[in-house]
Amino acid sequence: AQTQMAGWVQGNPNLARGEAKVILNEVNSANPSRLKGYVEVAGKKADVVIANPSGIQCDGCGVINAGRTTLTTGKAEVENGELKGYRVKGGKVTVGQKGMDNSQSDYTDIIAEKAEIKGGVWSKKGIKVTTGKNNVDRTNDSVVYVGDKNTDNTDRTSDTQGENQSYSVDVSQLGGMYSEKIHLVDNGQGLGVRNAGHIGASAGDVKIDSQGRIVNSGTISATHQADLNAEKVIENKGKIETKQGNAALRSQTRVEQHGSIVSRQGGVLLQTKDKVTQT
């Protein structure tokens, strides 16, 4: 097969019955995996999975010619030689300032207890980040929480050191996500989602579902809909914009709207069980 990185490479004789559909790279180590370059699938597209329960640090990494690229701190669940999903008990996936270039992968999944995005993440058709202690299926569609319940139902994101809070999904000022559609899921103990960078869906929706709060001081832009749902407070100090669909912010407590929400061809919905504060 012809490759971008290594030119012509010989086929694997152990795969005489056909190309691999899923390539699972499972690391059992006390240390996180550090990815600083590219991985390429030679031949027909395949799904690429890198799994390390101790964490994954990507800084200038990327995957070429993958249908789906998954970085996870979960343990791979394999039945009869078939990958079924991942069981996440902890661990963090960190993307450094040099970013993650999966622009030649169709879909990118980050599945971990926490995700910290300090650089850009690119993928062709979709990016989905799922955080928390969960059982997650192989395509990141079914998510079942298996960690301790937040039985006192407190807002775990609130403390006196606002900027030093810990979030399940944290996108810094230099961080960003760029794909046709983007979905962030905080299914943890209510630590929430913070975006100080740029989350941009070039052809579809941006969806954020959080068991805690959602704090946006950056830019969230969607070609279709921007749909933010939180159990706790939604605080917008930045910019939320849609070109064709609605911008919807739904909170089970309150919405604090201090930034701008622009819906060029749709409507703006602020829905809350308590109150909406606008300044």
Describe each model-derived feature in a short phrase.
Residues 155, 240, 275-277:
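A detector of low-complexity, intrinsically disordered, Ser/Thr/Gly/Pro/Ala-rich segments
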Residues 63-64, 71, 98-103, 121-122, ...:
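Sequence/structural signature of small/polar-enriched beta-strand/turn repeats
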Residues 1-202, 209-212, 219:
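Solvent-exposed adhesion/ligand-recognition segments of exported proteins
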Residues 1, 110, 129, 167, ...:
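All-beta strand scaffolds that present successive hydrophobic residues in beta-strands
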